[in-house]
């Protein structure tokens, strides 16, 4: 899937940069371009992508201090500047646009829904949001921001591919080390998904293409992405169990949103050398995902890739009923209840409701 990435806020800019870097290192060619947008000048300076500083008349390059209503207002007033930066970048070759944002910070949580809506009104391709949930220990402000942003962005984007920070954090890591590891892990997963049907080595029996990714996300709402890999045997028949076990791990323990196996649709992609991918294994994995998700809309296919390993990539669409999403929204509601002041109303009405019930 050919795409253009737009990172919003500090976390969004870093992850968009990591995705572009992964795509270039692998030679997939799925990421056509990447742009980072932020209200904090310092957070843009080290990024290896085109950058756009917004809100200079309001915050003078110092960021919005976690205020997502200010982040939304700044994006609303400066969106023309952002859209101008995309001229010549979102070409006819683009099959999608990904807005990448941390949903806990002010610029990302406030700006991403505004930008997604603006992009959808201009471009005739799906606009997805790759959103990062804050960890449970990241403070009440981040929980409130993310809860409101998730509810709003799910309405404005064609789908929200959600990443839970807590699913990737390892014990003993510093905060910066943890975020770097999360970015690398997500870049690998999303990079492989975007590359499906693009830069392939050899010819698979049933190669996944962009339309299958789009159809899996067509129902909208929240999506999750699972991944697992294992050593491959040279003989395809010997890899049936490997395909099954990696698919189970991808769904049960390797998703970007844990406990999200109840889905409206799914796509199972088995990546590896074409001669090592067992057709029976792919079909069995697809049927297992059908049973696990309760969905009859489960697609499956190959991603021919020069590698000594087999990987299972499972895209789950329509997972907003998952336990993890429900527990996060409850956490956000509790944070709102503890807030000492009522949030201000944003001038454009994007943040019209403090009620976090009924996500969609």
From Swiss-Prot:
Gene disruption: observed consequences: Does not affect motility. No differences in growth rate or cell size.
Any one GO MF annotation of this record: GTPase activity
Keywords: Cell shape, Cytoplasm, GTP-binding, Nucleotide-binding
Pfam families documented for this protein: CetZ_C, Tubulin
CDD domains attached to this UniProt entry: FtsZ_CetZ-like
Basic and acidic residues bias locations: 334-354
Gene3D superfamilies with a match to the protein in the record: Tubulin/FtsZ, C-terminal domain, Tubulin/FtsZ, GTPase domain
Domain of life: Archaea
Main location: cytoplasm
Amino-acid positions noted as binding GTP in the UniProt annotation, renumbered to this chain: 10-14, 65-66, 106-108, 138, 165, 183
Stretches for region Disordered: 334-360
One of the protein's GO biological processes: regulation of cell shape
Signal sequence interval, chain numbering: none
Keyword check for Ribonucleoprotein: no
Annotated compartments: Cytoplasm
GO (cellular component) term, any one: cell division site
Cytoplasm among keywords: yes
Family: Belongs to the CetZ family.
PANTHER family: CELL DIVISION PROTEIN FTSZ-RELATED (PTHR30314), TUBULIN-LIKE PROTEIN CETZ (PTHR30314:SF10)
Protein name: Tubulin-like protein CetZ2
Protein species of origin: Haloferax volcanii (strain ATCC 29605 / DSM 3757 / JCM 8879 / NBRC 14742 / NCIMB 2012 / VKM B-1768 / DS2) (Halobacterium volcanii)
